[in-house]
Regions:
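Ser/Thr-glycine-rich phosphate-binding loops at phosphate-binding pockets of nucleotides
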Residues: 8-14, 23-25, 74
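A short alpha/beta connector and helix-capping loop motif
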Residues: 15-36
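Active-site-proximal helix-loop-helix substrate-binding element of RNase H-like nuclease domains
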Residues: 30-37, 41-186
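Conserved "right-hand" nucleotidyltransferase catalytic core of DNA-directed polymerases
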Residues: 1-10, 14-16, 34, 134-255
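Cytochrome P450 core scaffold surrounding the K-helix E-X-X-R motif
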Residues: 13-17, 46-49
């Protein structure tokens, strides 16, 4: 095995766009739902983890094998998610040196930084499936409890087998599209120096920054005291119940 192309579908109660992948995977509710992969460009295989299937041992070994190059579109997401799945402690992750990101390749070529956008510009035969956004919202995020859904806060495969089947197809197609991007750009390789920069970037992000938590906690306390003091002064000055209210403050200013 020389290369492993990967795409994951995951669940977490943390909003990925707001928290970033590191906080996202630290949630106790985080889990990998679907694992689609291709070994050395072979037809895509899929592991339905949500329904009890297991990742083959040779694939698990390949994830930690520096001799196997792992590919994904926005590979940082797959690498960090799989680190959590493999039981790495918080702050420790799969080494980035054996990972390459086709989004970086797309960026190097001036293409859109999305799988859908890059595929469209390149005119790929197998485009990213458009219905994916709705399926991700359905299966990958908490849902609002309602009478019609039995007050549940999460949608599982059993709640909509048809949608789950479509979601599995979407997951497989993402790997196919990612591999097609690689094939189309094969004549325009990313220089080794750029991959070195990418790996350094990943190490920096994995390491994070040191934070003086005592200073942070004190700053929060000072902010609370300051807000209370300023609000009290404004109440004394204006006699308003809530001087933070724009409507009340406008009315006071016009008196």
């Amino acid at each position: 095995m020389q290369t492993l192309s990967i795409d994951l579908e995951t669940y977490s109660d943390q909003p990925l766009a707001k928290t970033g992948v590191y906080r996202y995977v630290e949630s106790p509710d985080f889990e990998i739902l679907l694992f689609a992969y291709s070994v050395d460009g072979a037809p895509v295989q899929q592991i339905d983890l949500a329904c009890g299937e297991k990742i083959p041992s040779e694939i698990l070994c390949a994830l930690e094998d520096d001799k196997v190059t792992k590919w994904a579109f926005n590979a940082n997401f797959e690498r960090i998610c799989l680190s959590r799945f493999l039981g790495y402690p918080t702050g420790d992750y799969l080494e980035p040196d054996s990972w390459k990101c086709s989004m970086v390749w797309a960026a190097y070529m001036g293409l859109p930084l999305s799988l859908e956008g890059a595929g469209a510009v390149l005119g790929l035969e197998k485009q990213k499936l458009a219905e994916g956004k709705d399926l991700i919202k359905y299966f990958c995020q908490p849902c609002a409890p309602t009478k019609s859904n039995g007050q549940r806060t999460r949608n599982l495969p059993k709640h909509s087998p048809d949608k789950w089947l479509a979601f599995k197809k979407y997951n497989i197609r993402d790997v196919e599209t990612e591999m097609s991007i690689q094939a189309r750009l094969l004549k325009y390789p990313v220089p080794d120096s750029v991959w070195e920069e990418y790996h350094l970037d990943q190490e920096i992000n994995d390491r994070g920054i040191r934070v003086d938590m005592q200073m942070v906690e004190n700053a929060i306390d000072v902010d609370g005291w300051s807000r209370f003091d300023l609000k009290t002064q404004l109440q004394d000055l204006t006699a308003l119940e809530n001087p933070n209210s724009v409507a009340q403050l406008k009315a006071w200013l016009t008196e």
